Regions:
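Juxtacatalytic substrate-recognition/specificity segment
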Residues: 1-115, 122, 126, 132-136, ...
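Active-site-proximal alpha-helical
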Residues: 147-168
Length: 168
């Protein structure tokens, strides 16, 4: 697939060069990417979940896939009418950094998961490393967000409220 080729030929080396290696818990040297419509309540506009990494998948336990896997949304991430797989490339880099970060922090260093705000910042940096460009798409949201204007803290990661402010 086009998505897999982009990951293998471009994203993988760029992200691992800056952030380190992924784990290999199943000893197959493969990373799985599951693309599906993440049921996130998207109503046609606003925020949606573009993808995610679930650290439990790296463990041999119940409700785990027991492998290196991350998940990419197909709706609306690929577009609503004309599907464009290239719209997911930055999300691939973003979610891959989460996997690497967990491997480095927890498995290699024996620590705990990195604070969400810092881990998300590093995943945003992975997007920039991959594209070679500054991420400017969120500047308008930052400038006009009412929660940021009211003092929304960089250190407080609000998963239930104004999620887009976290990424701005």
């Amino acid at each position: 697939s086009k998505l897999g080729k982009e990951f293998e030929n471009n994203i993988y080396s760029k992200v691992t060069n800056y952030f380190g290696k992924e784990p290999d818990v199943d000893n197959d040297s493969k990373i799985n990417i599951l693309c599906y419509d993440i049921k996130d309540g998207f109503s046609g506009s606003g925020a949606y979940i573009g993808g995610y990494f679930y650290a439990r998948d790296l463990y041999n336990m119940a409700y785990s896939n027991k492998c290196e896997i991350f998940y990419i949304d197909t709706y609306p991430a690929l577009g609503t009418y004309y599907k464009d797989v290239t719209k997911c490339y930055e999300t691939l880099a973003h979610e891959f950094q989460h996997m690497i970060n967990f491997n480095q922090s927890v498995f290699k260093e024996g620590g705990s998961s990195m604070d969400t705000w810092l881990n998300e910042g590093m995943s945003m940096a992975a997007e920039q490393v991959y594209t070679g460009k500054s991420l400017t798409s969120r500047i308008d949201y930052y400038n006009y967000s009412s929660s940021i204007g009211k003092g929304h803290s960089l250190l407080y990661w609000d998963n239930a409220g104004d999620v887009l402010s976290n990424y701005s």
